[in-house]
């Protein structure tokens, strides 16, 4: 019991860590590694679309074909369809099941391989799946208790991250709307011309050249840039005789400008 309690505390302590660490292509790699160590297994966290958010391989169980899926950070579509129909934790799935994560061509190498799949829920929604597997040894009751706790912890983290992303999207859209509402028709025309001039999201431009081409004064462009910069939509830097360096910080401005075309 003491060992189970200690492991439970280790899992719940993950919630106390900042979600700022959940960055990069595989934001849940560290979490998967911690859970794999605690439960003593391989572990993978996938979202509802099958994208791999993080994984940890304590034990070698894959071949080159399956390694490619992990490197691509996307599990096979047919496998994701299968696990999406797992609504409650299914433990100790054998090597012959379609739900096993072991490669079919390695059945003879891992005849006792076992997979456990736990759905991840958050806010009443299915957010993904927590998959763990071993070369042998059943997942016993203590392991399954930890799996249930782990899937809940991951679900809370996923939901929190989704909420933060939504709040950031709303903040950015609000900034764009407020900035656009301060622009005159000529300034909106100038902003469209400026952004079309960029190579991607940043680049160098000459305000006077753009002004002459679209038939407005240079001051209109300067005022438009100043308003966008104060709203945090762009950043600019004078390059002297070479013009102005411009970088777009809020990409939503492109979609907003389409409404005025």
Curated annotation (Swiss-Prot):
<feature type="region of interest" description="GAF domain">
    <location>
        <begin position="1"/>
        <end position="159"/>
    </location>
</feature>
<keyword id="KW-0678">Repressor</keyword>
<comment type="similarity">
    <text>Belongs to the CodY family.</text>
</comment>
<keyword id="KW-0804">Transcription</keyword>
<dbReference type="Pfam" id="PF08222">
    <property type="entry name" value="HTH_CodY"/>
</dbReference>
<keyword id="KW-0238">DNA-binding</keyword>
<dbReference type="InterPro" id="IPR036390">
    <property type="entry name" value="WH_DNA-bd_sf"/>
</dbReference>
<dbReference type="GO" id="GO:0005737">
    <property type="term" value="C:cytoplasm"/>
</dbReference>
<keyword id="KW-0805">Transcription regulation</keyword>
<dbReference type="GO" id="GO:0003677">
    <property type="term" value="F:DNA binding"/>
</dbReference>
<feature type="DNA-binding region" description="H-T-H motif">
    <location>
        <begin position="207"/>
        <end position="226"/>
    </location>
</feature>
<dbReference type="GO" id="GO:0005525">
    <property type="term" value="F:GTP binding"/>
</dbReference>
<dbReference type="GO" id="GO:0003700">
    <property type="term" value="F:DNA-binding transcription factor activity"/>
</dbReference>
<dbReference type="GO" id="GO:0045892">
    <property type="term" value="P:negative regulation of DNA-templated transcription"/>
</dbReference>
<comment type="function">
    <text>DNA-binding global transcriptional regulator which is involved in the adaptive response to starvation and acts by directly or indirectly controlling the expression of numerous genes in response to nutrient availability. During rapid exponential growth, CodY is highly active and represses genes whose products allow adaptation to nutrient depletion.</text>
</comment>
<dbReference type="InterPro" id="IPR013198">
    <property type="entry name" value="GTP_trans_reg_CodY_C"/>
</dbReference>
<dbReference type="Pfam" id="PF06018">
    <property type="entry name" value="CodY"/>
</dbReference>
<dbReference type="InterPro" id="IPR029016">
    <property type="entry name" value="GAF-like_dom_sf"/>
</dbReference>
<dbReference type="InterPro" id="IPR010312">
    <property type="entry name" value="Transc_reg_CodY_N"/>
</dbReference>
<dbReference type="InterPro" id="IPR036388">
    <property type="entry name" value="WH-like_DNA-bd_sf"/>
</dbReference>
<keyword id="KW-0963">Cytoplasm</keyword>
<dbReference type="InterPro" id="IPR014154">
    <property type="entry name" value="CodY"/>
</dbReference>
<protein>
    <recommendedName>
        <fullName>Global transcriptional regulator CodY</fullName>
    </recommendedName>
</protein>
<dbReference type="InterPro" id="IPR011991">
    <property type="entry name" value="ArsR-like_HTH"/>
</dbReference>
């Amino acid at each position: 019991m003491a060992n189970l309690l200690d492991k439970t505390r280790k899992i719940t302590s993950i919630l106390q860590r900042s979600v700022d660490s959940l960055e990069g292509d595989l934001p849940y790699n560290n979490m998967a590694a911690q859970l794999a160590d605690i439960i003593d297994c391989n572990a993978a966290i996938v979202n509802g679309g099958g994208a791999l958010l993080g994984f940890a391989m304590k034990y070698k169980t894959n071949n080159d074909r399956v390694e490619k899926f992990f490197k691509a950070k996307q599990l096979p579509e047919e496998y994701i369809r299968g696990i999406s129909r797992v609504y409650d934790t299914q433990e100790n799935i054998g090597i012959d099941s379609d739900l096993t994560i072991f490669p079919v061509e390695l059945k003879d190498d891992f005849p006792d391989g076992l997979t456990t799949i736990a759905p991840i829920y958050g806010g009443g929604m299915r957010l993904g799946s927590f998959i763990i597997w071993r070369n042998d040894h059943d997942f016993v009751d203590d392991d399954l208790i930890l799996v249930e706790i782990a899937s809940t912890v991951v679900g809370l983290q996923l939901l929190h991250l989704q909420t933060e992303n939504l709040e950031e999207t709303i903040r950015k859209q609000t900034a764009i709307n407020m900035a656009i509402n301060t622009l005159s028709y000529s300034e909106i025309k100038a902003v469209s011309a400026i952004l079309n001039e960029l190579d991607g999201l940043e680049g160098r431009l000459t305000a006077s050249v753009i002004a002459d081409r679209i038939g407005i004064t240079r001051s209109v462009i300067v005022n438009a840039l100043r308003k966008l910069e104060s709203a945090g939509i762009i950043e600019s830097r004078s390059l002297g005789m070479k013009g102005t360096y411009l970088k777009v910080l809020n990409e939503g401005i492109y979609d907003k400008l389409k409404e005025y075309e």
